[in-house]
Amino acid sequence: MRILLVTHPPLTAELGAPQITLRLAAALRERGHDAPVWSPAPVPAGFGSFRRRQTAAIERFAAENGPFDVIDTPVTSASRRLARQGHLVVRSVQPELPYLFHNHAGQLRHHPGPRAAYHAVAALPTAAGLLAGWRRARLILCLGTLELAWMRRRFPFWRHKLGLWTGCPAPEERDLLTAVRRQRATVLPGPGVRFLWIGRWAEHKGTRRLVRFLHERLAAFPADTITIAGCGPSAAEDLPAEWLRTHRIRLVPSFGRAELPALLAGHDAGLFTSEVEGWGLSLNEMLESGLPVYATEQGAVPDLRPDFPTALRQFPPGPTIELMSPAEPGPAYEERFNWASIARSWEIQVQESRLSK
């Protein structure tokens, strides 16, 4: 098949959505498909909203470089014109409606007033656009079982076109993560626990929950420290200056993929505090590197728990931190979570949806 895979951010492995789209495309090419990846970034200036100009750029690219048997795109770009240019697959990289509801509910809760109410009402056309994109899709691939269950409950009339896909590290990164796991000490190396939190500093990532936890934890355990990585420049505004000055908290606003193994190796336990999450590739990365992870029940957590029954733990951590069992993950993990299997599953679901026209 000739498949166009679309991602909105710039095509770089440093960003989550392009990273997993590039990996999926590479795995599909290994299966013999012609699978280019394209991004409209940077979106051209012009008239109309940013989203409309973004979608128009994708429509132009598909028209000028087609025909395509399948067009795999985020739901916000699933337009009528794109649906006419190929078998339209909407592949989720984040739970769009829950994100939208969570963000505006948070604004109304924490900053009530006319401005927050106005923005909540103004988001209704965005929600309508998401519904329209799902309606046009021939196949909706939900990211993880949590999102699939959510979509089935709210949109039972689309059950026939709901599918599932997952994510995992690239093969070359997996080898590095395995090496980190095998070199881990069997006891904590210092008097305190070195926690690691990875993600954008955004409310849906559970930053308020994280800060509340840190106030309690750092007061009760003076030797504990935490690194907050990939957070951008804004995290410092929400954290006490004393914590930063005394290095109880270390901020790493950004890091390259090559720096990830050393970052993981230098910590004892991971934290995952999301309130709404798509998948959370950092979960795979922390667990595969041998870190026990204290996590909220979001993103990939229920999908990964069968393979990490003791390493994947409920947030917040208790007073004692036990290291990860060397028996985890079991052999079934890499059979389920590898890009060859993910691409094969994508292929089967797309072929079935094409036959059901």
Residue ranges of predicted features:
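A conserved mid-protein helix/loop that constitutes part of the nucleotide-sugar donor-binding site
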Residues: 19, 23, 193, 200-216
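Membrane-proximal helix-turn-helix segments that form the acceptor-binding/catalytic region
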Residues: 112-140, 149-153
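Nucleotide-activated donor-binding/catalytic signature segment of Leloir-type glycosyltransferases, i.e.
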Residues: 237-255
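Acceptor-binding helix/loop patch of EC 2.4 sugar-transfer enzymes
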Residues: 90-125
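Aromatic "clamp/platform" in nucleotide-sugar-dependent glycosyltransferases that forms part
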Residues: 275
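Glycosyltransferase donor-sugar binding loop
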Residues: 198, 225-238, 253
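Short hydrophobic beta-strand element within catalytic cores of glycosyltransferases
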Residues: 292-295
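A charged, aromatic-enriched C-terminal amphipathic alpha-helix characteristic of glycosyltransferases
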Residues: 49-53, 179-181, 315-357
